[in-house]
């Protein structure tokens, strides 16, 4: 009987040892799995943040480019509108060309062209 007890005791120790080893192995595997998942999650988060930041920066650059183009276009339209309004006022005789102050520095070609137009208007009587 002692032989059986001793045999079963040894077997029990073996099973307990195996269970402990299995439990330890499962725990280690779970820890490694957790580490792996956390690593992948952290890297994914970094990449997502980097991608979002990159997209936001590109969007900001594009918005700046568009706003610069819009401002430039608005300035051009405003300048042309003022020029045309001045031309209409001069042509209709409401104001004289000399009474208008220059809205922007003119280039040489534009200044001589306007002088010719004023001279022609004076000859034709403003019609």
From Swiss-Prot:
<dbReference type="GO" id="GO:0048488">
    <property type="term" value="P:synaptic vesicle endocytosis"/>
</dbReference>
<dbReference type="GO" id="GO:0050808">
    <property type="term" value="P:synapse organization"/>
</dbReference>
<keyword id="KW-0597">Phosphoprotein</keyword>
<dbReference type="GO" id="GO:0048471">
    <property type="term" value="C:perinuclear region of cytoplasm"/>
</dbReference>
<comment type="function">
    <text>Plays a role in neurofilament network integrity. May be involved in modulating axonal architecture during development and in the adult. In vitro, increases the susceptibility of neurofilament-H to calcium-dependent proteases. May also function in modulating the keratin network in skin. Activates the MAPK and Elk-1 signal transduction pathway.</text>
</comment>
<feature type="repeat" description="1">
    <location>
        <begin position="20"/>
        <end position="30"/>
    </location>
</feature>
<feature type="modified residue" description="Phosphoserine">
    <location>
        <position position="72"/>
    </location>
</feature>
<dbReference type="GO" id="GO:0043679">
    <property type="term" value="C:axon terminus"/>
</dbReference>
<dbReference type="GO" id="GO:0007268">
    <property type="term" value="P:chemical synaptic transmission"/>
</dbReference>
<dbReference type="GO" id="GO:0046928">
    <property type="term" value="P:regulation of neurotransmitter secretion"/>
</dbReference>
<keyword id="KW-0206">Cytoskeleton</keyword>
<dbReference type="InterPro" id="IPR002462">
    <property type="entry name" value="Synuclein_gamma"/>
</dbReference>
<keyword id="KW-0677">Repeat</keyword>
<feature type="repeat" description="2">
    <location>
        <begin position="31"/>
        <end position="41"/>
    </location>
</feature>
<dbReference type="GO" id="GO:0005794">
    <property type="term" value="C:Golgi apparatus"/>
</dbReference>
<dbReference type="GO" id="GO:0008344">
    <property type="term" value="P:adult locomotory behavior"/>
</dbReference>
<dbReference type="GO" id="GO:0005737">
    <property type="term" value="C:cytoplasm"/>
</dbReference>
<dbReference type="GO" id="GO:0005813">
    <property type="term" value="C:centrosome"/>
</dbReference>
<dbReference type="GO" id="GO:0043025">
    <property type="term" value="C:neuronal cell body"/>
</dbReference>
<feature type="modified residue" description="Phosphoserine">
    <location>
        <position position="67"/>
    </location>
</feature>
<dbReference type="InterPro" id="IPR001058">
    <property type="entry name" value="Synuclein"/>
</dbReference>
<dbReference type="Pfam" id="PF01387">
    <property type="entry name" value="Synuclein"/>
</dbReference>
<feature type="repeat" description="3; approximate">
    <location>
        <begin position="42"/>
        <end position="56"/>
    </location>
</feature>
<protein>
    <recommendedName>
        <fullName>Gamma-synuclein</fullName>
    </recommendedName>
</protein>
<feature type="repeat" description="4">
    <location>
        <begin position="57"/>
        <end position="67"/>
    </location>
</feature>
<dbReference type="GO" id="GO:0005829">
    <property type="term" value="C:cytosol"/>
</dbReference>
<dbReference type="GO" id="GO:1903136">
    <property type="term" value="F:cuprous ion binding"/>
</dbReference>
<comment type="similarity">
    <text>Belongs to the synuclein family.</text>
</comment>
<dbReference type="GO" id="GO:0070062">
    <property type="term" value="C:extracellular exosome"/>
</dbReference>
<keyword id="KW-0963">Cytoplasm</keyword>
<feature type="region of interest" description="Disordered">
    <location>
        <begin position="96"/>
        <end position="127"/>
    </location>
</feature>
<dbReference type="GO" id="GO:0009306">
    <property type="term" value="P:protein secretion"/>
</dbReference>
<dbReference type="GO" id="GO:0005819">
    <property type="term" value="C:spindle"/>
</dbReference>
<dbReference type="GO" id="GO:0014059">
    <property type="term" value="P:regulation of dopamine secretion"/>
</dbReference>
<comment type="subunit">
    <text>May be a centrosome-associated protein. Interacts with MYOC; affects its secretion and its aggregation.</text>
</comment>
<feature type="region of interest" description="4 X 11 AA tandem repeats of [EGSA]-K-T-K-[EQ]-[GQ]-V-X(4)">
    <location>
        <begin position="20"/>
        <end position="67"/>
    </location>
</feature>
<feature type="modified residue" description="Phosphoserine; by BARK1, CaMK2 and CK2">
    <location>
        <position position="124"/>
    </location>
</feature>
């Amino acid at each position: 009987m002692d032989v059986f007890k001793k045999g079963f005791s040894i077997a029990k120790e073996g099973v307990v040892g195996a269970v402990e080893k299995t439990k330890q192995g499962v725990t280690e595997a779970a820890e490694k799995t957790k580490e792996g998942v956390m690593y992948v999650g952290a890297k994914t988060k970094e990449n997502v943040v980097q991608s979002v930041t990159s997209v936001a920066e590109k969007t900001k650059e594009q918005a700046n480019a568009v706003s610069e183009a819009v401002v430039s276009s608005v300035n051009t339209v405003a300048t042309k509108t003022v020029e045309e309004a001045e031309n209409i006022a001069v042509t209709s005789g409401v104001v004289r060309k000399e009474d208008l102050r220059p809205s922007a520095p003119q280039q040489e070609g534009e200044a001589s062209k306007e002088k010719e137009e004023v001279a022609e208007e004076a000859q034709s009587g403003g019609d």
